[in-house]
Amino acid sequence: GELLAMSQRGNTITEQNVDYVLALTKEKSSVSLVDIDKELVGFTIQGKPIKPKTLGQKKYVDAIREKMMVFGVGPAGTGKTYLAMAMAIQAFKQDEVGKIILTRPAIEAGENLGFLPGDLQSKIDPYLRPLYDALYQIMGADSFLKNSEKGLIEVAPLAYMRGRTLDNAFIILDEAQNTTPAQMKMLSLIHIS
């Protein structure tokens, strides 16, 4: 029934869909593949729908909608950052938040920025590139730059968050597993009202 309903909605049935329906049936899940397929997070700048593809992604999106703080844990490439960014952009467009802040630790795997060539921006840009790529795909470079110039969307290394007051903001901390205990403590001291 699930696969037929998907087919009738114009979706191509893939091997992944079949495997997924079998897994849902085995789990006796109350959520169907059709329910997951109906969930819409937003659209890319090209008009392509952004939606969860798995039950785990649907639960993640639901948690972001319902909770103030959500931790997304999973292997690389499973859509954690992309879906969170799509949710942030939707919340921003619908005036649910006044600002989007995307941050990640700039120093990963013991690297030291001081030894890299160039100014500070050229040193941190490679660490922030995945965030920019997703932003450009979801909202377009022009819209991002316009909102960035107004201070409504910020992409910055985690170290720049020290001493901030972040009111009415959707904050995404990417690659949180690479934070130090001191950085996590600093995050707990950021004022959010």
Protein language model annotation of sequence segments:
Residues 72:
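Hydrophobic anchor at the beta1->P-loop junction of P-loop NTPases
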Residues 153-170, 180-184:
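Conserved RecA-like ASCE ATPase "motif II neighborhood" in helicase/translocase motors
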Residues 79:
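Conserved glycine(s) of the Walker
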Residues 82-150:
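Conserved P-loop
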Residues 175:
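Walker B catalytic acidic pair
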Residues 1-37:
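Interdomain "pre-motor" coupling segment immediately N-terminal to P-loop NTPase/helicase cores
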